[in-house]
A protein has these predicted regions:
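N-terminal secretory targeting modules
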Residues: 1-97, 106, 111
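Conserved SGNH/GDSL esterase-like catalytic core that processes O-acyl groups on lipids
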Residues: 88-177
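Loop/turn elements at helix/coil->beta-strand transitions in domains of secreted/extracellular proteins
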Residues: 95-97, 154-158, 189-194, 234-237
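Second-shell loop/turn segments in exported
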Residues: 132-137, 164-173, 185, 210-217, ...
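Active-site segments of SGNH/GDSL-like serine hydrolases
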Residues: 161, 165, 186-218
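Generic structural signal for well-ordered alpha-helices
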Residues: 178-182, 224
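Catalytic His-Asp segment of secreted/periplasmic serine-dependent ester chemistry enzymes
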Residues: 202-283
Length: 283
C-alpha cells in the first residue's frame, strides 16, 4: 500500500486547526517499524514496492490519564466478543499498554505522533500472507517478526489492521490467514484484549487511477463482513473503524485521502476518537 501524506489540516483533539501539511515526495524503499518502548524505536529500510509517509511535526496529544469506566464498573467481560458497540469513553492512557499491528496505514500512528504512548509494530508492504514469517520489525538491536516483537512488549491490548494489500485475493483464504494471526497474537500476548479492525473504504475514483481499477468498496465490505464473523468465532472484538470514513456512497471522501486509500493526518485523530468510544475497560 502506498502511503502519501497529502495536504491536510492537523487538528488537536479539541478540533482546533493548528497546522497544514505540505505534500511530500516519498522514498519507496523505506519500511518503518516503530515502538514506544525505549528499546524499540527505529526505522528499518528493507526492499518494498510501496512508499510510506514521511514524518511530520508531532500533533498535540491529549493529556494522558487513567481510563474512564462506566458507573457500573464495566469489565472485560461486559461486552460479548464480536462487533463492539459504542462504550463509555476512555482516555489516552488506555493505549499505554496497547500494541498496533499492521501495514503502511498503521505506521502513520507513529509518524504523525497521533498517540505517542502506544506501541506500533508495522511495516510498509506487510500483509496477511507474510505477517507471521517476515522479519520486518526493528526491535532494539534485533530485526524480528511481528509476533516475536509482540512477545517482548507485555501488551494488554492488541489492535490489528491488515488486508488492504490483498483485498482482491480469495477472501476465504484471507480470513483463514487472519484466523492464524489471531491465534498467534493470543499465544504471544495471552493476557491481552484483541481488537480486529475493519479494512478502510477507498475513494474509488482516485484509487482506480492510481492503483487498480478492479477494486471497489463492495470487495472491502464483503471481506469486512467475513472478518466480523471470524472475530465472533475467535472470541475477539471487531471494530468497524471504516464507518468513520464512509460517506453516503459507502466510499471515502476525497478530502480524507491523498491517494484514494491512505488517510490524511487529521483522519488519524478521527480514528483514535472512534477507538476511545469502542474500548473494553480492562479489569
Amino acid at each position: 500500500a502506498v502511503f502519501s501524506a497529502a495536504a491536510a489540516g492537523i487538528w488537536q483533539l479539541n478540533s482546533t486547526p493548528v497546522q497544514a501539511l505540505k505534500p511530500l515526495e516519498l522514498d519507496p524503499s523505506v519500511v518503518a517499524a516503530f515502538s514506544s518502548s525505549p528499546q524499540a524505536v527505529a526505522i528499518q529500510a528493507i526492499p518494498s514496492s510501496e512508499p510510506e509517509p514521511s514524518s511530520q511535526e508531532p500533533l498535540p496529544e491529549e493529556a494522558s490519564s487513567e481510563p474512564a469506566q462506566s458507573a457500573s464498573g464495566q469489565s472485560e467481560s461486559a461486552q460479548t466478543p464480536g462487533a463492539l458497540e459504542e462504550q463509555p469513553r476512555v482516555t489516552s492512557a488506555y493505549f499505554d499498554d496497547a500494541v498496533f499491528i499492521g501495514d503502511s496505514i498503521t505506521t502513520g500512528i507513529k509518524l504523525y505522533d497521533v498517540m505517542s504512548n502506544t506501541t506500533v509494530l508495522a511495516s510498509t508492504g506487510i500483509g496477511l500472507e507474510n505477517i507471521l514469517s517476515k522479519p520486518a520489525i526493528k526491535y532494539g538491536e534485533e530485526t524480528l517478526t511481528a509476533m516475536q516483537a509482540l512477545a517482548k512488549t507485555g501488551a494488554r491490548k492488541v489492535y490489528i489492521m491488515l488486508g488492504a494489500n490483498s483485498i482482491l485475493g480469495d477472501h476465504d483464504t484471507m480470513v483463514g490467514l487472519y484466523g492464524n494471526l489471531i491465534d498467534e497474537v493470543r499465544r504471544n500476548a495471552p493476557d491481552s484484549i484483541i481488537y480486529v479492525q475493519s479494512v478502510l473504504p477507498i475513494n474509488e475514483e482516485i484509487f482506480h487511477v492510481k492503483y487498480n481499477p478492479n477494486t471497489d468498496n463492495s470487495d472491502i465490505m464483503d471481506f469486512n463482513t467475513k472478518l466480523a464473523a471470524l472475530a465472533a468465532e475467535k472470541q475477539v472484538y471487531y471494530l468497524d473503524v471504516g464507518s468513520v470514513f464512509r460517506d453516503e456512497t459507502g466510499g471515502m471522501p476525497a478530502d480524507y485521502t491523498p491517494d484514494g486509500m491512505h488517510i490524511n493526518s487529521a483522519q488519524y485523530i478521527m480514528w483514535f476518537d472512534y477507538l476511545k468510544t469502542h474500548a473494553i475497560a480492562a479489569e
